Amino acid sequence: MPCRREEEEEAGDEAEGEEDDDSFLLLQQSVTLGGSTDVDRLIVQIGETLQLDTAHDRPASPCAAPGPPPAPPRVLAALSADKTGTPARRLLRPTGSAETGDPAPPGAVRCVLGERGRVRGRSAPYCVAEIAPGASALPGPGRRGWLPGSVASHRIQQRRWTAGGARAADDDPHRLLQQLVLSGNLIKEAVRRLQRAVAAVAATSPASAPGSGGGRSGPDSVTLQPSGAWL
């Protein structure tokens, strides 16, 4: 009797194993035989079922008007794009981009990274700001006139400031002050003028006699003159 029970158990285990093998083969056969059209059809059916389930789960209000059906999921659009041969990554780009031909609004600033014909000089690996046509000039580094090349040329022009140019612009003190501030020579010019004023006062002041002034000694008074007298 124990031998028969063991044989029956072994036979039952073998039968279960054969059933498992058959089901595995059937499952594998059903998956491998299906083509791309079957897979697309199955995905469409699953999407429709999910939409129907969500529509049934929502409580329908009696006052609400029937609205348009919900939009299909983006997975189906991606699958259809793959089926037609177009790259699916185009779906990730926002609508109304530069590729569709829509012009940018006036004043829009965009960054150009490595585009040929637009990046010049040493700013090739960096972001160069460009203003859309029809926009006014923006202040600050976003303006085209403040690119590295123009800044360098502007500094070179400031260094070429000479005494002759200062004499010519002496009639306008605001312009002279602006030139000194831009060139960075404001402090140097102030020290130079103070030294000239002290030397001029020392040369024009009469020598004080010894004992005069009641024994009072102190620094000479310095009178500052207009800038035109020294230049």
From Swiss-Prot:
- What GO cellular component is one of the record's annotations? nucleus
Keywords, ordered alphabetically: Wnt signaling pathway
The reply to whether Hydrolase figures as a keyword in the UniProt entry is no
Cite the record's Acidic residues compositional bias ranges.
7-23
Note the Pfam families from the entry.
GSK-3_bind (PF05350)
Region feature (Involved in GSK-3 binding): 172-194
A GO biological process held by the record: Wnt signaling pathway
Instruction: Please state what the protein is called.
Output: GSK-3-binding protein FRAT2
**Gene field:** Frat2
